[in-house]
Swiss-Prot record:
The keyword RNA-binding applies. Keywords: Ribonucleoprotein, Ribosomal protein, RNA-binding, rRNA-binding. The gene is rpsO. CDD domains: Ribosomal_S15p_S13e. Belongs to the universal ribosomal protein uS15 family. GO terms for molecular function: rRNA binding; structural constituent of ribosome. This is Small ribosomal subunit protein uS15. One of the primary rRNA binding proteins, it binds directly to 16S rRNA where it helps nucleate assembly of the platform of the 30S subunit by binding and bridging several RNA helices of the 16S rRNA. Forms an intersubunit bridge (bridge B4) with the 23S rRNA of the 50S subunit in the ribosome.
Length: 89
């Protein structure tokens, strides 16, 4: 399932300070998380799809880098994002 405009708007409202703040790190992590979950579901149906698996690994790496950035800037924001997205760190 792709990211719809409505879903993106909801994520921006939830994690961003305003509706126009799409570049905030928390917003980007939330969008990466949704794309990762979509690709994970796709790979469960199509286990031999190696190109999508590579894309999934690249998204996981991007999310990890973004989470490390948030953790280095403000640990409280990091913990809040981890709790809201139910990530394992």
């Amino acid at each position: 399932m792709s990211l719809t405009k409505e879903f993106k708007a909801d994520v921006i409202k939830q994690f961003g300070a305003s509706e126009k703040n799409t570049g905030k790190s928390e917003v980007q992590v939330a969008l990466y998380t949704r794309r990762i979950s979509d690709l994970t579901g796709h790979l469960q149906l199509h286990p031999k799809d190696k190109h999508s698996r590579r894309g999934l690994l690249m998204l996981v790496a991007k999310r990890k880098k973004m989470l490390n950035y948030v953790k280095n800037i403000d640990i409280d924001r990091y913990r809040k994002v981890i709790a809201e997205l139910d990530l394992r760190k």
